[in-house]
Amino acid sequence: MSVVDKNYHKKTYHKYDHNKWVLIIYVKSVSHETNIDKFFYENTIDSLDSVINISSICLYTLNDQLSKILVDIQPKCKIPINLCVDSDNDILNTMKLHLDNNLSIIYFTNNTGFSVQQKQCHSLDCLSAYTTCIYDDLYSKVLNKFGLSKLITFDTLVVPNNNDSRKFIDNCIYFCRKLIGTDNEFKINLSLTITDSRMGYIVKDLETDLEIPNNNFVRNIVDKSFRQYLTEQFCSVKNNFKKCELPWKDDNFIYYPYLDMNVFPCDESVQNISYTSCNTNGFITNETNPFGKLFTRFNNPYEGVYLKKPQNNIQIPKHLHHIWIDEEPSINYINLWKTILVEPWKYTIWDNNSVLDLIKDTHWDQMYNCAKQSRQKQLIAMLSILEKYGGITINAYNIPLKSLDSLTIGNKFFVSFLAEDTGTSLSYRIIGSLPGGLGKNMIDPNISRKPYEGINNFFRSVNYNKTNDFVIPEIFDKLKSLLHVSVLNSNNTHNNFSKEIDYFLLSLSGQNIFIYPSYYFNANISTLPKRLSNKIIMINLQKYPDKKPIRIKTEVHRPYVVTKEAIADQLNENPKDKLKNIK
């Protein structure tokens, strides 16, 4: 929740300045893990403060237990916040009390709020609300008695300080007292519905009423894309927010199509700001753990986010491990890798027998033999190899397009996304890492030794960690435990066995792990923007029967079509057959 700074806003609706408003935020349910953003749009108070004079904020709950939770998660702002318990759910009398004190009211429930999207807002002139209609046989008999066909519940209610509002609330209280029953929430909704119909539908619908052309109220704040859109609209209204020039020519940034970060943008007016990400809308952020905040927001590959590469002297060993555990190694693939890998690179082929020899009598042995899925076996083989030797592991069906040198610099551990357009699931066709034993009385090549500290400074124990970041041995230990649970869980399907592993790796800070975009290692050329084609490092030719190719029209015009099948045919073709076609 952003702290309100009134210097950032200009009062634009002077006709409301003579009125004082109270915000009523009614929280009916919340868990211990919830923060205010889960049920109330975070920029509501900032946005409304630029429109009206807010005298106070009332945060209502139904019981003392909820009240104790909300003490820690209530929004932080300079406007007084009163935390109240309304065990009787007597919201109508609460509104009457505020009206008697000459205060206008805005009532919010879960997943609602207000955002400055338009320069003019007409939704504060009269009684207005977001409504939800309920058609239920359980209430049909009661509704028929009053000539009603539906029950209206109010998600957001604007009650300006005028005679119509007082009359409306008084009538609601009158009908609510006449109704018999123990369900207070139903009685309140029914009294609101009856009063609205008897007064000629005086409450304007914020969603459909043509008399409210500019509506800044929002509801159902559950979609991350919509929340981020509202946040950017809020930032654009503030004069000191300026859009950043996109770093698409800066080699220190990597572009991720479809993705964005679910965080509040940095204020670019701050002098000498150093940012770690910038989306294609020009909003920047400075997050130490960018990957845990990423989500699929955009609908096309031309919109996304730029993330800064790691800036350090760490270097992964230049050793490529090619995994062939499902079938015999293909000489065509092997020759391609041997051609592109030059000194000091090492190249090792691992088949099923060599993997079994490596993991014999280790903690990986039981997991590998119990794994039922090929993807599980491949991941176990990759991690067991990296733990001992470090370097880069790839599965069988990868062919190189350029050198892998750039992947070894600045990374402790790296993987890639599977397909950004469908989410932030990770791909394990390629994994790179420092040796997993690093820190357990092994030489750490990334620690500088001062002359007077002697040889002991070359060594670091597992407990040595000035920050709370994971070190490589801890990452491998955690991956072992997660894989062990995944292998033993018979309910895991082909697609979700790595869900917990994905979650763990995404939660690590950017100093411990880097996640590359999918097009680096598994590009869909038909959908990829042309300017990114030179970033592709390798192509994966493995086929999955349940994955259908996505085809969209691109701006690239060629007399030929590049497909994975065509590349595979060229690789499988015997060079002698090519000579036969030459006359």
From Swiss-Prot:
MF GO annotations: mannosyltransferase activity
InterPro entries named among the record's database cross-references: Glycosyltransferase_domain, Nucleotide-diphossugar_trans
UniProt GO cellular component terms: membrane
Domain of life: Viruses
GO biological processes: mannosyl-inositol phosphorylceramide biosynthetic process
Name under which the protein is recorded: Uncharacterized protein L263
